[in-house]
């Protein structure tokens, strides 16, 4: 989603929120939480407070008038009723069942509410230096996490990774084979952004950065000589990330046409651009997701940019057998989250043995 549109939607939600949610928003913006994260949280609060009004828990006329005391006095039974409401209400997102939304969606909603309650009961200070209230009902609410072993996750993920020669094979396919099947009109559209698309996908495959980190890159963040990019990690931390050498020609080809193709001026600092009505703009995450899905589905299997991150991590672990190195490359504080890649690589080793 483009930043301008995102901020417009955030402003619309802020206009209907209670004052204490607006204080929460300002506090988290200072952390800083990303605008995308805060937008998702505001949507969850909109859903929750709409239910508060519909269920009669508050007799306020509108959402912004719901008093803080409603949250303070919310019972465990009330919150469980809200969870049941979510389970039985379909169409909250694409991952619905006949019975209602997925457990993942419910957990996301509860996570947003837990963050708000923690702020109100622990983090904020009133004039006396105390939180607004102390009773945190969210600590009494249990969440059900999806049960899946690392081996099961590895089995599910590995079919959607471009390992071995498939990494550069994917890039070669986009460059040489994909355009051969296009109509003249589609080919013209493809050629307009070919270098950019290849540069983005190559960078994701060669660095393992998150999609948000890639689209937020500025020109100054790329050091082609050293093959290093400076990114803003989760929580606003800056980090320098090494990029594999195979991405260099794709990045060079894009930079060679960037200014002329996208009609840039000095104010256009974003690394990856798109043209809208002749005006260059930073490419948004949604556009990259659609682009990766289109090319990957035609090549092998439809994947998300996050699977390209998994691809890099798996290849790096396979080459180094170092979880520490992989965790540093991905920007993780611990090696626990990299355990998944050991299972994927073990499966690859087993397949190699079976072929002997």
UniProtKB/Swiss-Prot annotation:
Superkingdom of origin organism: Bacteria
Keywords: Cell cycle, Cell division, Chromosome partition, Cytoplasm, DNA integration, DNA recombination, DNA-binding
Active site (catalytic residues): 210, 234, 306, 309, 332, 341 (o-(3'-phospho-dna)-tyrosine intermediate)
Domain Core-binding (CB): from-to ranges: 16-121
UniProt subcellular location: Cytoplasm
One MF annotation (Gene Ontology) recorded for this entry: DNA binding
Any Gene Ontology CC annotation: cytoplasm
Pfam families per the UniProt record, alphabetical: Phage_int_SAM_1, Phage_integrase
UniProt cross-references to CDD domains, sorted A to Z: DNA_BRE_C (cd00397)
GO biological process: cell division; chromosome segregation; DNA recombination
Record entry for activity regulation: FtsK is required for recombination.
Sequence ranges assigned to domain Tyr recombinase in this UniProt record: 169-354
NCBIfam families given in the database record: PRK05084.1
Entry's family note: Belongs to the 'phage' integrase family. XerS subfamily.
Functional summary from the UniProt entry: Site-specific tyrosine recombinase, which acts by catalyzing the cutting and rejoining of the recombining DNA molecules. Essential to convert dimers of the bacterial chromosome into monomers to permit their segregation at cell division.
Protein's recorded name: Tyrosine recombinase XerS
Native source species: Streptococcus pneumoniae (strain Hungary19A-6)
């Amino acid at each position: 989603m483009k930043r301008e549109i995102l901020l417009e939607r955030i402003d619309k939600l802020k206009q209907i929120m209670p004052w204490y949610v607006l204080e929460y928003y300002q506090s988290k913006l200072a952390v800083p939480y990303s605008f995308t994260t805060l937008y998702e949280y505001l949507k969850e609060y909109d859903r929750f407070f709409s239910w508060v009004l519909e269920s009669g828990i508050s007799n306020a006329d509108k959402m912004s008038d719901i008093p803080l005391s409603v949250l303070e006095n919310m019972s465990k039974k009330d919150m469980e009723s809200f969870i049941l409401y979510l389970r039985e209400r379909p169409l909250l997102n694409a991952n619905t069942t006949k019975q209602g939304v997925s457990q993942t969606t419910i957990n996301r909603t509860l996570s947003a509410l837990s963050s708000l309650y923690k702020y109100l009961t622990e983090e904020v200070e009133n004039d006396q230096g105390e939180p607004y209230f102390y009773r945190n009902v969210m600590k009494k609410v249990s969440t059900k996490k999806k049960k899946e072993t690392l081996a099961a996750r590895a089995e599910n993920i590995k079919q959607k990774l471009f390992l071995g020669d498939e990494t550069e094979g994917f890039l070669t396919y986009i460059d040489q084979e994909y355009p051969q099947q296009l109509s003249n009109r589609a080919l013209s559209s493809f050629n307009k952004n070919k270098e950019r698309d290849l540069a983005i996908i190559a960078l994701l495959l060669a660095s393992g950065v998150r999609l948000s980190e890639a689209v937020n890159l500025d020109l100054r963040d790329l050091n082609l000589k050293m093959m290093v990019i400076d990114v803003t990690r989760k929580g606003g931390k800056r980090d320098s990330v090494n990029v594999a050498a195979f991405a260099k020609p794709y990045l060079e080809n894009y930079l060679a046409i960037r200014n002329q193709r996208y009609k840039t001026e000095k104010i256009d600092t974003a690394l990856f651009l798109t043209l809208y009505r002749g005006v260059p703009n930073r490419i948004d995450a949604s556009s990259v997701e659609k682009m990766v899905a289109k090319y990957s589905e035609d090549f092998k299997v439809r994947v998300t940019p996050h699977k390209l991150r998994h691809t890099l991590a798996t290849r790096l672990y396979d080459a180094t057998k170092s979880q520490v190195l992989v965790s540093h490359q991905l920007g993780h504080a611990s090696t626990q989250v990299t355990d998944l890649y050991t299972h994927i690589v073990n499966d690859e080793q087993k397949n190699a043995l079976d072929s002997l």
